[in-house]
UniProtKB/Swiss-Prot annotation:
GO cellular component terms given for this protein: nucleus; replication fork; replisome
Entry-linked PANTHER family: DOWNSTREAM NEIGHBOR OF SON, PROTEIN DOWNSTREAM NEIGHBOR OF SON
Higher taxonomy: Eukaryota, Metazoa, Chordata, Craniata, Vertebrata
Polar residues compositional bias, start-end: 125-140
UniProt function note: Replisome component that maintains genome stability by protecting stalled or damaged replication forks. After the induction of replication stress, required for the stabilization of stalled replication forks, the efficient activation of the intra-S-phase and G/2M cell-cycle checkpoints and the maintenance of genome stability.
InterPro entries reported for this sequence: Donson
Key words, A-Z: Developmental protein, Nucleus
Record-given protein name: Protein downstream neighbor of Son
Gene: Donson
Family: Belongs to the DONSON family.
Cellular compartment(s): Nucleus
Segments of this protein annotated with the region Disordered: 1-140
Compositionally biased residues, Low complexity: 34-53
Quaternary organization: Component of the replisome complex composed of at least MCM2, MCM7, PCNA and TICRR; interaction at least with PCNA occurs during DNA replication.
Transmembrane spans: none
Amino acid sequence: MAVSVPGYSPSFKRPPETVRLRRKRSRDHGAAVPASLPEPAPRRAALAAGLPLRPFPTAGGRGGAAATIARRNPFARLDNRPRVSDEASEEPLRGPQGASGPLLDSNEENNLLWEDTSSHERTGTELSQSQRVSLSESDTWSSDGTELPVDWSIKTRLLFTSSQPFSWADHLKAQEEAQGLVQHCRATEVTLPQSIQDPKLSTALRCAFQQALVYWLHPAFSWLPLFPRIGADRKMAAKTSPWSADETLQHALMSDWSVSFTSLYNLLKTKLCPYFYVCSYQFTVLFRAAGLAGSSVITALISPTTRGLREAMRNEGIEFSLPLLEEIGHKKKVRDPSLESEEEQAVSDEDEEESFSWLEEIGVQDQIKKPDVISIKLRKEKHEVQMDHRPESVVLVKGLNTFKLLNFLINCKSLVATSGAQAGLPPTLLSPIAFRGASMQMLKARSSNVKTQALSGYRDKFSLDITGPVMPHALHSMSMLLRSSQRGSFSAGLYAHEPTAVFNVGLSLDKELDRKVAREDLANCGLHPKTLEQLSQRPVLGKSSLRSVEMSDYILSWRS
């Protein structure tokens, strides 16, 4: 017969004695613990150093008032509660221009997603998330007197503000509108006085403004937004595209597009067109005539690119360079000459294949584990793949290779999307002058005024909003017009199409360009002489573009 043991229950369903004993142990243990525990030495040192620590765990028990030593939480050392006062004190450190957009670090910039949306339709939250700042972008203002640095990026929006009204830009008369179009087609040079007393009564100013808004586009469909093309699938999703499922119509569109593209290149080659853009759903190409950007030959920049596109260009015999990678590599060598060991490592990688053949000769290739050919190739191409779709992937083509690039783009099957909202739609051609098959388009301009709070009450603030594909010549023309109409005082916010910001990268030139001769050769390209002089300068902005411009007393300052 089994002997019953006090506190033991064979069924383990109702162990009353066990529970009673545990409660008794807890009371006895709590009585032996002092009411206040001394703080550990590391905690005292941290408090002396001024670290914000949580209160030291006090004694407490599970059984009502019984006291037990609470186990320490290793993750609760620092006070991670939000501190409003600290965040408020850090806000002024961003400077007076800090509210225009957040400055992102280099990692966020490298993970840049180029999905462009119309800036005037964005909310404040969307705008702060979409504005991306390149690595060379700074929050300091630079001044170069009376001229801006050349900016080859395409702007999607210009927002000018001034203490003087922009009413002169509204409701142009029929005669002024017609005269402005004629001035554009005939490339009439307009010279305005330094200051216009009554801009609304100045016919020359209003005609010049109409002239500056004109640009040329192919193809043109009034119901379809054709710029920007990168990341525009969402905008085009609800639009009608009759060519998406009609191969005959797609072939006709591509045939007309090839004729227009060839016409533009011929105008560029004969220096009758200064530059033009090819905007596809994957990348953008900038063709520049000889004499612009400090180059004595025709240049073409492509951004962003992928390893597949670069490999296809190599297979077609197109010689190109990666200017940003060359610039970064040169800076690294200047800072650290020991980087030559990396080149030696690359040479050793090439010798690996020879070592494998030597193993086969001595007959031990099966006994030694070696990487396969695919692994070796992937390791060599790792760095090249990592820069795909990034600003560092920008490609520069110069001289006669630009003609090869022309033929490559015309025959490239991946130039046109095969599915999605842009299926079957040829790339967009943008040019400052007319070309075969082009359609004349106008930038949209709208002026308004708001009340802003000042020390003495409220004052009027006037704004001029220009939207559309604003090319470099249009930005310079607008700055010259506003210099006269706003009496040398205005500010501007510039919104760039991010894939084109990298077009401001500097070029490695074989010889110095005679800018005077270049301007004479391009005298018939359709641009104002002052605009042509600015575009002939070498780019200095690098991967960034102009973000803000301010003119005060006819002195320009800018921020990139």
